[in-house]
Amino acid sequence: YFEWTTYKSKVKPFYDVDVFYESKEEQEKNIEIIKNETRDLLKQIYPETTIAIASSHGEKYKNKSVNKVKTQIKGYAISFHFVMCDYETTVGELKVFNELNGLYDVKFKDTNLKMFDKAVYRDGGNMRFLYSYKPNDDRQKVPDNYKDSYCLTKHVIQSSNATNHFRRALPDTVSPPTTPPVSPKPKD
């Protein structure tokens, strides 16, 4: 199942995070780190939200070009979907909000990896719903929180009376996003 959205669709702010690792150990080590860094940043931007988090981690193949020769690389994906409940906007307004506030340039600490996938903010696109799969992909999207049947509407992107209680406007001003600070390393 998918949700179809256009630039004019009323939605809750949503963010897609996709990180690829060639090593399963690196992927497993970073799942909670990536989830926590992303959630902490989004909570600063949307202070009055509850955040519905879903994931679809697992084995993934990625195309890589070297000297114009495409090869497929086996790796492991970390994939999260964050939905800001109790806020409402349109896909087009959210795309502009994210651009104006530099959210597409935020990187995970100690990495060169960008936090947010901006390709999901398009005029006409399918967003996968819970318990669904992308075509030709074995990774199922499952809720990390709000798993009870009466809470699953928190994961729905489209905003309506049935899916979104307060429907607050996007914040007027946002502090410039920063990569979360690095904790000092203990001295030997």
Residue ranges with predicted function:
Residues 1-114, 127, 133, 178-188:
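Signature for HUH/AEP ssDNA processing cores
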Residues 51-53, 118, 161:
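Residue-level detector of intrinsically disordered, flexible termini
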Residues 96, 141-143, 170:
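General "foldedness" signal
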Residues 113-151:
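C-terminal polymerase-core module
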Residues 149-188:
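Long, charge-rich alpha-helical interaction segments
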